[in-house]
Amino acid sequence: MAVDKREFVNVFDYEAAAREILPKFAHDYYRSGANDEITLHENHNAYERIKLKPRVLRDISKRDLTTTILGQTVSMPILVAPTAFHCMAHPEGEVATARAAGTAGTIMMLSTLSTSSIEDVMSEATGLVWFQLYVYKDREATLSLVQRAESAGCSAIALTVDAQIWGRRERDIKNHFRLPEGLSIKNLMPAGREQFPKEQADSGLAAYVTWQFDPTLSWKDVEWLCSKAKVPVLLKGVLHPEDARLAIDHGAAGVIVSNHGARQLDTVPATIEALPEIVEAVDGKIEVLIDGGIRRGTDIVKALALGAKAVGVGRPIIWGLAVDGEQGAKRILDILRKDFDLAMRLCGCTSVEEIK
C-alpha cells in the first residue's frame, strides 16, 4: 500500500497508516491491551485530564533539550521503550530501530523477545542501548543474556518485574497468535527457547511465557541480578510506592513506572497517575522514568513536571517502523522531539531542568 508520508504530522497519522499495512494478527498484537482494555485507553486519556499552567514574558529563543539518565547524556528525555518482535513490522526490525534511536541521539531499550540478536543490533547501533530482561526459569540462561548484553555494549539492564505470568490479551487469543514463518526469538538461539511451543490452545506467546518465564521471581532475584550485573539495573513495571522504596533497598539504580503498555492487569492506574507517589517515595535516591500512553509533546512536559527523568515510547515506534522502516521510526522521534520543544517553549521553559 502506497502512503503519502508528507501528510503525516503526528504519531496518530502513522498509527492509522500502520493499521492498513500490517497483517491483522500483527497489528492486533502490537496495539492490544489486556481484557477490556480500560487501562489501555486510560494511559493516554489520563494525560488529557492534566492541565498545564504556562509562564509568560520569558526569553525562550534558546533551548536545551538534553538531559542525563544514569549519568548517560541524551539529546532529549524521550527514549525508545522495549517492544518485542520488530521484524513483524519491518524486515530490518530492531536493527532499524537502533539506528533510528542513535541518529536521534537517544536510548533504545532492546527487548529480550527481539527478532534480532543482541549482537546484530549492537553492531549497527550508533547510540546508547539498554537491554530489557525477562527472568527465565533457567537462571544460567538469564545470566547469559545479561553477560551478552554487557559484552556487546549495552549500558543498563531494565528488568521487567510485572510479567512473570502473562496477561489475558483477548485479541491474541482469538488470532491464535504466533510468530510468522522465518521469525524467532533470536536472543535465545540455539538453546531451544527461540520458538513458541508447538502445541497451543490460544496465544503462542502466552504459552511461551508459561513454559519459560519464572513465576517465582522475587526481591531476592533483584539482589542477585544487581550483584551480577556490571551495569546499572532498573526495575520496569513499578506502580506501587512501596515497591519503589524496596527497589532502593535491593540495589536498583532506577525504576520505570509502567503497566506493560496496559497488557498485563487491566484496570490498574494509568502510569501518569501512579507517577507522583513513586517520585515522592524514592525522594531523589534513584531515577524515575515512565512509559505508557505518551503521544504528544505536552504529555512529555507533564511527565517531567511530575518528576519523571524521561519518558519511554513504544507503540508509536512500531507504527513508524511499519510505515517506513528506519526512517519511519526516526520520524516518530523527530515529531515527538519537535512537539516537546514547542510545548516546553509555550510553557515558558528553556530546558528540561526548568520543567522540573
Say what each PLM segment does.
Residues 1-48, 273-290, 294-356:
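Alpha/beta catalytic cores of nucleotide-metabolism and tRNA/nucleoside-modifying enzymes
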Residues 33, 111, 132, 159, ...:
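Active-site-adjacent beta-strand anchor residues
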Residues 85, 99, 103, 120-124, ...:
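Alpha/beta enzyme core
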Residues 1-71, 169, 176-217, 353-355:
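An N-cap/entry alpha-helix motif that binds or orients negatively charged groups
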Residues 51, 66-68, 77-81, 107-111, ...:
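Short, conserved beta-strand segments within well-ordered enzyme catalytic domains
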